Design a protein with these regions (language model features):
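Electropositive polyanion-binding surfaces
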Residues: 1-21, 25-462, 471-478
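Short, compositionally biased
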Residues: 480-484
């Protein structure tokens, strides 16, 4: 059953404008890009093109920001190199493209359309780490010891070449023994052994973080499936060993970058999640499930509780995860001044963290890249502290706005898909119950809607049969009543 995507595209653009984004690039930015004759080059940098680099991303991603490669050193230690797209050389500070990126601050991904932070000639071509292409990159290098702790690290620029463009789904299935070796991997000698090695290292990194209280959450994010411009299905985005591999490597790389800037006496645009103010409510959730959490925020205790609940009730765990995420509060960007107190990331259980690994997609990462390059060159920081403060505040606000745009379009896509299924019955789980209303997550297709009648006696986690009574595509409303 399909639904028109044209309406969804219009709603996505409308949502962008309403949230303060500029969905189109201004003429001066496009003129700047048109004047670029090719990708940036620098013959003075290290030449690492012969290494078996590979990218792992979504199936349809063309804005490739990262490549990874690993090398065994002995005694269980492994050297990891993460190559990050060199964007700053093609997008100088205070140019038209930079000013547009600074206003939007992020790429926005909706089912109907992607609104890239940078023009596609850059993000999917000249500054993308595309397969088979020579590119400049920022290298974040670190040694992972046998126990998952980090050893020596370094940052430098180099030339790289992506030997295999891989996708999360096929790599994850292959790693789990549930699918064949992906064709691009089979065509690139040595990449299969590389990914196996990287998977082992990533598991050590993850285990180390979990020991220190990193939270292992599972929030369901349905994605609209488009075919010939129409919404044909909603599917959950599956996390697997391939997504975990990249997440663990990027977390490590971001920490190395934060500590590098600190050691150089540079300011940094830190990514923080503060200690949760609503810890009392998280404790109440745990108590309702027969568990006790400490009186003050304790990441390790919360992590242990979540691991236990995932095992005890995997069906309801995504809903518990969503509640915890909301109670933890959103992440934000802050300025870390040299010698000043550092704020950490509660959810990742790390004290030093920046965003540095996606400069094609996020403005904070481009800012961080400029800071790194200045530090490497022995130059002054390209941003004054007060300018960084403004960037941090604006990026936090725009990230929240982008999430709202993406959520609004997901809801409208779900309403589009369901509008021909009025009066059908669905099985669901109550995900929210308050004076503002009762909300139900339907299992198939994976959508959430409001229970407008028959909510008496229901609470979060209860299973319930519901009947669809109305949808509003424009507003993304889906209304259910309790089925008799």
């Amino acid at each position: 059953m399909s639904a028109r995507g044209a309406d969804l595209g219009r709603l996505a653009r409308q949502a962008m404008i309403e949230r303060g984004f500029e969905p189109d690039f201004p003429p001066d930015a496009m003129r700047q890009v048109a004047a670029l004759s090719g990708p940036a080059t620098d013959g003075s940098t290290r030449d690492l093109r012969a290494l078996p680099w590979a990218s792992i991303d979504n199936d349809d991603s063309r804005d490739l920001d990262q490549l990874t490669v690993a090398e065994e050193l002995g005694d269980g230690a492994v050297r990891v190199r993460v190559a990050i797209a060199e964007v700053d050389t093609s997008v100088a500070k205070d140019t038209p493209v930079d000013r547009h990126a600074r206003r939007n601050t992020t790429s926005v991904y909706t089912a109907a359309r992607i609104f890239p932070m940078l023009p596609e000639k850059l993000s999917t071509d000249l500054t993308s780490l595309a397969a088979g292409e020579d590119r400049l990159a920022m290298i974040i290098e670190f040694v992972v010891k046998d126990d998952g702790s980090l050893g020596v690290s370094d940052l430098y620029r180099a030339r790289v070449r992506n030997q295999a463009k891989l996708a999360y789904g096929s790599v994850g299935a292959w790693l789990a023994g549930q699918g064949p070796m992906p064709a691009p991997m089979a065509a690139a000698p040595g990449v299969d052994a590389q990914i196996r090695l990287q998977d082992r290292v990533a598991q050590k990194l993850a285990a180390r973080r979990l020991e220190h209280g990193a939270l292992e959450l599972e929030v369901l994010e349905p994605r609209a499936v488009m075919q010939d411009g129409e919404v044909v299905d909603l599917r959950q985005q599956q996390h697997n060993r391939a997504t975990q591999l990249i997440e663990d490597f990027m977390i490590a790389a971001n920490g190395v970058t934060a500590r590098y800037l600190q050691a150089k006496g540079f300011p940094a645009l830190r990514r923080v999640v503060r200690s949760p103010e609503r810890w009392d409510r998280i404790r109440a959730l745990a108590a309702g499930l027969g568990e006790t959490l400490p009186g003050t925020p304790d990441a390790k205790a919360l992590a242990d509780f979540l691991v236990k609940r995932r095992t005890a009730d995997p069906l309801r765990f995504p809903d518990l995860s969503l509640c915890v995420v909301k109670l933890l509060g959103r992440g934000e960007y802050t300025v870390q001044r040299p010698g000043g107190p550092a704020e950490g990331h509660f959810g990742l259980a790390v004290s030093d963290y920046v965003h540095s690994t996606a400069p094609n997609r996020r403005f904070p990462d481009l800012v961080t890249q400029r800071l790194i390059k200045a530090a490497l060159a022995g130059a002054r920081p390209p941003y004054a502290d007060d300018e960084l403060e403004g960037v941090a505040t604006h990026c936090t606000e725009q990230e929240d706005a982008a999430s709202r745009v993406e959520r609004q379009v997901r809801k409208s896509a779900a309403a589009l898909l369901l509008r021909s299924r009025i009066d059908e019955r669905f099985d669901g789980i109550v995900t929210g119950a308050s004076p503002k209303g009762t909300w139900v997550r339907v299992l198939n297709p994976p959508v959430e809607g409001k229970l407008v009648h028959g909510w008496d006696g229901l609470d979060v986690g209860d299973r319930v049969a519901v009947r669809l009574v109305s949808v509003n595509v424009e507003r993304g409303f889906i209304d259910f009543v309790r089925a008799g």
